[in-house]
Curated annotation (Swiss-Prot):
This is Nodulation protein E. Proposed to synthesize NOD factor fatty acyl chain. Involved in the synthesis of a highly unsaturated fatty acid moiety, which forms part of a lipo-oligosaccharide that is responsible for host specificity. Belongs to the thiolase-like superfamily. Beta-ketoacyl-ACP synthases family. The gene is nodE. Its main location: membrane. Coiled coil: none annotated. The keyword Manganese does not apply. Pfam families: ketoacyl-synt, Ketoacyl-synt_C. One of its GO terms (molecular function) is 3-oxoacyl-[acyl-carrier-protein] synthase activity. It comes from Rhizobium meliloti (strain 1021) (Ensifer meliloti). Residues 2-401 form the Ketosynthase family 3 (KS3) domain. Its EC number is 2.3.1.-.
Length: 402
């Protein structure tokens, strides 16, 4: 069954803001949310920057449900409710079996895991908090979204590190195309700003000491952030039948694996995923106006991605617009490509390419137009989003104007 899949609602929160309007406002302007961490439970960890959600917005999550939720689930549920409101949809007994959710989570509920560790091994406790297990499981965010909204169709978690959200969106597209659902909530959530995760990334020598500078000479690494992004996906027929406002079409999906190294990037994997995405969408390389790059700010990743883009797009690589919005919201792991989906869809909606913030000076190995520091007005009919994870799991999406 070849059904077109469209986006009719989006929700999100991250260091930039607690709804899609504020996220896009500051993303578009190139304002960075990266700064010193204010979390009081980092147990003496100093000198690490990140992008925090400093205060949660008001929400109507049931208190009985809230006690069983880790931060990743809370973020996902808040974003999911916003997406449903924008889409003008609600779930009821008549349609619940045709509504589902796929939520990408790169790390899981490490806040609950760390608290259990400290209770047992530091404080000398004998038992963990009762909901530790269900808070920490990678599928928790998807389950909590399902329960909060009453979704009874296909519901599952997706985990593939930094490409989790794009994989979740791709999986949701498949559910609709295969006829298993009419509506899917899809995206990602992660909350990595906890002591144990930050220490693990510090040990890999991957963290930047100051800020995230994708594609800029002198870039020093990744900055972690927390957040969530969710989209309402519908079959085109379902959306038009109810008179929905269509924000964009998910035109293509490209998936691949490097099969190379657990941390080091390879060119062939990202290249294959981008080529597969173009083929799935029926697009030529020249059709892409804007590419939201994976762009983590590490020397190896940004150079590798630049090479892959040149291989796929040829001369057009130098004329299309590219940017990495991780420079504004940081690397939110499982939520990263969900937030970048918001960037792509809004670029299509408003004809503005968000910039790569914090850019200082050109790197001759990253010589493409990465929209440094200043947004650019441009007609965007097709936008592509790259997500390339540690372990070499790659997921690329193409979004198209409808």
């Amino acid at each position: 069954m070849d059904r077109r899949v469209v986006i009719t609602g989006m929700g999100g929160l991250c260091g930039l803001g607690t709804d899609t309007t504020s996220i896009w406002k500051w993303m578009r302007e190139g304002r960075s949310a990266i700064g010193p961490l204010l979390n009081t439970e980092l147990h003496g960890l100093k000198g690490i920057v990140g992008a925090e959600v400093k205060a949660l917005p008001d929400h109507n999550i049931d208190r009985k449900q809230l006690v069983s939720m880790d931060r990743i689930s809370v973020l996902a549920v808040i974003a999911a409710h916003e997406a449903m409101r924008q889409a003008g949809l609600s779930c009821n007994e008549g349609n619940a079996l045709r509504f589902g959710a796929t939520v990408g989570v790169g790390l899981g509920g490490w806040d609950a895991t760390e608290k259990a560790y400290r209770t047992l091994l530091v404080d000398g406790g004998t038992r963990t908090e009762i909901f530790t297990g269900v808070k920490a499981m990678p599928s928790a965010a998807a389950c909590q979204v399902s329960m909060s909204l009453g979704l009874r169709g296909p519901v599952f978690g997706v985990t593939s590190a930094c490409s989790s959200a794009n994989h979740a969106i791709a999986s949701a597209v498949d559910q609709i195309k295969c006829g298993r659902a009419d509506v899917m909530l899809a995206g990602g959530s992660d909350a990595p700003l906890v002591w144990i995760v930050l220490k693990a990334w510090e040990a890999m020598r991957a963290l930047a000491p100051d800020t995230c500078r994708p594609f800029s000479a002198g870039r020093k690494g990744v900055v972690l952030g927390e957040g969530a992004g969710m989209a309402v996906l519908e079959s085109y027929e379902h959306a038009t039948a109810r008179g929905a406002t269509i924000l964009a079409e998910v035109a293509g999906v490209g998936l691949s694996a490097d099969a190379f190294h657990i941390t080091a990037p390879a060119v062939h994997g990202p290249e294959s995923a981008m080529r597969a995405c173009l083929a799935d969408a029926g697009l030529n390389a020249e059709d892409v106006d804007y590419l939201n790059a994976h762009g983590t700010g590490t020397k190896a990743n940004d150079q590798n991605e630049t090479t892959a883009i040149k291989r796929v797009f040829g001369d057009h690589a130098y004329s299309m617009s590219i940017s990495s919005t991780k420079s504004t919201h940081a690397h939110c792991i499982g939520a990263a490509s969900a937030l970048e989906m918001i960037a792509c869809v809004m670029a299509i909606q408003e004809g503005v390419v968000p910039p790569t913030a914090n850019y200082r000076e050109p790197d001759p190995d990253c010589d493409l137009d990465v929209t440094p520091n200043v947004p650019r007005e441009r007609k965007v009919r097709v936008a592509m989003s790259n997500a390339f994870a540690m372990g070499g799991t790659n997921a690329v999406l193409a979004f198209k104007q409808v």
